[in-house]
């Protein structure tokens, strides 16, 4: 989910920083 663009915080999201 693109709630947090910061992968630093949510790294569990997909590789897409969308």
Curated annotation (Swiss-Prot):
Keywords: Antimicrobial, Fungicide, Plant defense. GO terms for biological process: defense response to fungus; killing of cells of another organism. May possess antifungal activity against B.cinerea. This is Putative antimicrobial peptide 1.
């Amino acid at each position: 989910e693109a709630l947090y663009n910061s992968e630093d915080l949510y790294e569990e999201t997909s590789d897409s920083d969308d």
